Amino acid sequence: MTKKKAYKPGSATIAQNKRARHEYFIEEEFEAGLALQGWEVKSLRAGKANLSDSYVTFMNGEAYLFGATITPLNVASSHVVCDPIRTRKLLLNKRELESLFGRVSREGYTVVALSMYWKNAWSKVKIGVAKGKKDHDKRDDIKEREWKLDKARIMKNANR
């Protein structure tokens, strides 16, 4: 018989980029690993990450996460220089890199970070291939969300 995995309290999600889903149509999602330094892992365990303005850039055939902020802890070692907004290398397969690079360069898409989470002991980033929304698309999304809430409220009162 296999042993049950120990329950870990709390959520595996470190940070989410809610603004990305509002600003872009997400076409496809990928999971990527992150090349981190020791102080960054400590900060992520404390939940001190922000993905609000982050996106993926391509340099020398590799993908980098740009604009993600990981705030250093006060108790982190003093001999290490902590740069909270440094670009971090994304760990992707060659096939995934080529697919992302091709879509960004040819079809006018952009790649944004959607969320950061723990998968076992590894920190992962969910990135999405996205196309920008126009203002009227954003307004339509807001109207649809409000109608969903109103509909739920009406149905709740109708069952009484």
From Swiss-Prot:
It is found in: Cytoplasm. InterPro entries: SmpB, SsrA-bd_prot, SsrA-bd_prot_CS. GO terms for biological process: trans-translation. Belongs to the SmpB family. This is SsrA-binding protein. GO terms for molecular function: RNA binding. Its main location: cytoplasm. GO terms for cellular component: cytosol. Keywords: Cytoplasm, RNA-binding. Required for rescue of stalled ribosomes mediated by trans-translation. Binds to transfer-messenger RNA (tmRNA), required for stable association of tmRNA with ribosomes. tmRNA and SmpB together mimic tRNA shape, replacing the anticodon stem-loop with SmpB. tmRNA is encoded by the ssrA gene; the 2 termini fold to resemble tRNA(Ala) and it encodes a 'tag peptide', a short internal open reading frame. During trans-translation Ala-aminoacylated tmRNA acts like a tRNA, entering the A-site of stalled ribosomes, displacing the stalled mRNA. It comes from Pectobacterium carotovorum subsp. carotovorum (strain PC1). It comes from the Bacteria. PROSITE patterns: SSRP.
